[in-house]
């Protein structure tokens, strides 16, 4: 319901306006005061001894940050740099912090997004609610540039480049601050970032257009790859910020969909729940982010759909040029 109020002007939103508006004003005052305290030095912030690139957004919910992080890490690796990734590990609880992710780390300990990033890139990934501690853990792993997954509003960590990801379809909803609207910060905050990446929809003049390019479906048990259109009677599920985006992608791939089930972002799943869901079709298909949480109890007819961020070559070059410019003062040449 909150999504409908934020993005679709549901009538209930007008009824709740008098109740929620004061809290949005308070949220804005606290947010601005907190940021100013970091900017003036009244609150301490950590300056890492190597470049920090933040990938985040100004709205609550999923905007496509993780594919951008994966693309950025792979791009840095291809340039010869040694990137490490910092994440808060939303929705997870590790035995201790900081946690450096490895092949055996369960998603329940590190979070679905850090696990996905590690599996896709093999770059060092450190999880800690205090991101400066995660950075310090990565320094022991020979990295020479830090990429933070989310954290645009985590001003306790100083940064060299800011990349904001925007949902090109939903944009900023009613353009109100939480809880009346989806905004973590005012839209004007985007005037200060280095790059605005627009996921889907139509990018504006100062934005970089991104599309998510799907590949073949991958079997969770065997790793077999298969065109989505060849899988019969698919039951689709998605525990992401905008499930309908995933379902629309499947339709564009001519998927034989018999049922679509959306879940909350970062939803925890169990075998019984998904076995029951899978009975509604011949195959169960999910996002790659969901797959990292379901691999331990996956069945032979469960699949996931990987997607990769794609940009126009000139847009990629703009980002690469900025990274190289920022790396120089740190004396962090590529390996």
From Swiss-Prot:
ATP binds at residues 59-66. GO terms for molecular function: ATP binding; tetraacyldisaccharide 4'-kinase activity. Keywords: ATP-binding, Kinase, Lipid A biosynthesis, Lipid biosynthesis, Lipid metabolism, Nucleotide-binding, Transferase. It catalyses: a lipid A disaccharide + ATP = a lipid IVA + ADP + H(+). It is an enzyme of class 2 (transferase). InterPro entries: LpxK (IPR003758), P-loop_NTPase (IPR027417). Its EC number is 2.7.1.130. It comes from the Bacteria. The keyword Lipid biosynthesis applies. GO terms for cellular component: plasma membrane. GO terms for biological process: lipid A biosynthetic process; lipopolysaccharide core region biosynthetic process. Pfam families: LpxK. Pathway: Glycolipid biosynthesis; lipid IV(A) biosynthesis; lipid IV(A) from (3R)-3-hydroxytetradecanoyl-[acyl-carrier-protein] and UDP-N-acetyl-alpha-D-glucosamine: step 6/6. PANTHER family: TETRAACYLDISACCHARIDE 4'-KINASE, TETRAACYLDISACCHARIDE 4'-KINASE, MITOCHONDRIAL-RELATED. Transfers the gamma-phosphate of ATP to the 4'-position of a tetraacyldisaccharide 1-phosphate intermediate (termed DS-1-P) to form tetraacyldisaccharide 1,4'-bis-phosphate (lipid IVA). Belongs to the LpxK family. This is Tetraacyldisaccharide 4'-kinase. It comes from Vibrio cholerae serotype O1 (strain ATCC 39541 / Classical Ogawa 395 / O395). The gene is lpxK.
């Amino acid at each position: 319901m909150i999504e409908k109020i934020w993005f679709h002007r549901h009538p209930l939103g007008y009824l709740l306006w008098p109740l929620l508006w004061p809290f949005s004003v308070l949220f804005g005052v606290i947010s601005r005061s907190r940021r100013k305290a970091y900017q003036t030095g009244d609150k301490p912030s950590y300056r890492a001894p190597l470049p920090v690139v933040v990938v985040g957004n100004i709205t609550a919910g999923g905007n496509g940050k993780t594919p951008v992080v994966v693309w950025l890490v792979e791009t840095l690796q291809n340039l010869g740099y040694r990137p490490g990734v910092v994440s808060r590990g939303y929705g997870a609880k590790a035995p201790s912090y900081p946690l450096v992710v490895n092949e055996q780390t369960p998603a329940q300990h590190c979070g679905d997004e850090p696990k996905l990033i590690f599996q896709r890139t093999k770059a060092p990934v450190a999880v800690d609610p205090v991101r400066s501690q995660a950075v310090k853990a990565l320094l022991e792993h020979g990295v020479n540039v830090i990429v933070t997954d989310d954290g645009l509003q985590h001003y306790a960590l100083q940064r060299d480049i800011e990349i904001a990801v925007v949902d090109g379809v939903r944009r900023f909803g009613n353009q109100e601050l939480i809880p009346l609207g989806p905004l973590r910060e005012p839209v004007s905050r985007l005037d200060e970032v280095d790059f605005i990446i627009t996921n889907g929809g139509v990018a504006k003049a100062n934005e970089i257009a991104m599309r998510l390019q799907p590949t073949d479906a991958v079997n969770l048990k065997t790793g077999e790859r298969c065109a989505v259109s060849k899988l019969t009677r698919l039951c689709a599920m998605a525990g992401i910020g905008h499930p309908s985006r995933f379902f629309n992608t499947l339709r564009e791939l001519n998927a034989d969909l018999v049922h679509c089930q959306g879940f909350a972002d970062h939803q925890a799943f169990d075998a019984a729940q998904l076995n029951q869901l899978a009975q509604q079709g011949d195959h169960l298909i999910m996002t790659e982010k969901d797959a990292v949480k379901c691999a331990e109890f996956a069945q032979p007819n469960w699949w996931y759909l990987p997607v990769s961020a794609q940009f126009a070559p000139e847009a990629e070059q703009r980002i690469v040029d900025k990274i190289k410019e920022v790396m120089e003062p740190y004396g962090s040449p590529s390996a």
